[in-house]
């Protein structure tokens, strides 16, 4: 009989929300609403919040807006909740500066995306992440692999080379591959906590050794995701599977077009006026919005 696998730690909890950035009618960041939404997400089961990542529209936020968002959310939720700042860039120098600023502004960690557009080789990726890790050694890092957006994938073997950086503690796997979890665990060992970057792959990734999820759907179904995770961890696999199947249509709807367009509409439909995304993203079209409204209504009845 094979020995039992060693489970990974959970440096940021199990359910993290990749938080939207609210805008007012003039397109300005609504920091007051951001604080209220952050507290609501925690009340609904999130143990951590990721501020100014992909869902937070980081490409269209200034660095000043991002720093203030971090400070507002940090103050809103208090010290008992993990707050991660999106500090990635395709410029290593810019990412280093942003990560240092996040550490100084009270972040519990940084989500650092693979550099986009310039398509560095694996050796360049290793050097990039090592420079960031060394620049803020006190700040735990979550490496973020999302090749569908960046055009480059961080190989498990490259991640393994970074395991001698003590603050490289976690990995957001958003390549769409369940096998990536196993490959990361085999290459890096259990010290690297792998988080699913896709709500729809959370349950199968948990079975492969992931510790949790950086979620979009938790904006509107946080308690149900928490219930699914807890059921799986307690051995109630049928209960977890039932939740997964009930939530799958919502997972699909939230990515029927570019994130965060649908989730912002879902929040609006749920009473949170977070505003439209900034250009070049657009509000959800009326047909998709109507379909999403029907899904949310049906879920409230189950």
Swiss-Prot record:
Binding site for pyruvate: 55, 214
Known EC number: 4.3.3.7
InterPro entries (UniProt xref): Aldolase_TIM (IPR013785), DapA (IPR005263), DapA-like (IPR002220), Schiff_base-form_aldolases_AS (IPR020625), Schiff_base-form_aldolases_CS (IPR020624)
Cellular component GO terms, alphabetical: cytosol
Residues the record marks as site: Part of a proton relay during catalysis: 54, 117
Keywords: Amino-acid biosynthesis, Cytoplasm, Diaminopimelate biosynthesis, Lyase, Lysine biosynthesis, Schiff base
The protein's annotated pathway: Amino-acid biosynthesis; L-lysine biosynthesis via DAP pathway; (S)-tetrahydrodipicolinate from L-aspartate: step 3/4
SUPFAM superfamilies linked: Aldolase (SSF51569)
Substrates-to-products reaction catalysed: L-aspartate 4-semialdehyde + pyruvate = (2S,4S)-4-hydroxy-2,3,4,5-tetrahydrodipicolinate + H2O + H(+)
GO biological process, one term: lysine biosynthetic process via diaminopimelate
Leader peptide range in chain numbering: none
Family per similarity comment: Belongs to the DapA family.
UniProt-listed PANTHER family: 4-HYDROXY-2-OXOGLUTARATE ALDOLASE, MITOCHONDRIAL, DIHYDRODIPICOLINATE SYNTHASE
Quaternary structure annotation from Swiss-Prot or TrEMBL: Homotetramer; dimer of dimers.
Protein name: 4-hydroxy-tetrahydrodipicolinate synthase
Species assigned in the record: Synechococcus sp. (strain CC9311)
Organism ancestry: Bacteria, Bacillati, Cyanobacteriota, Cyanophyceae, Synechococcales
Gene giving rise to this polypeptide: dapA
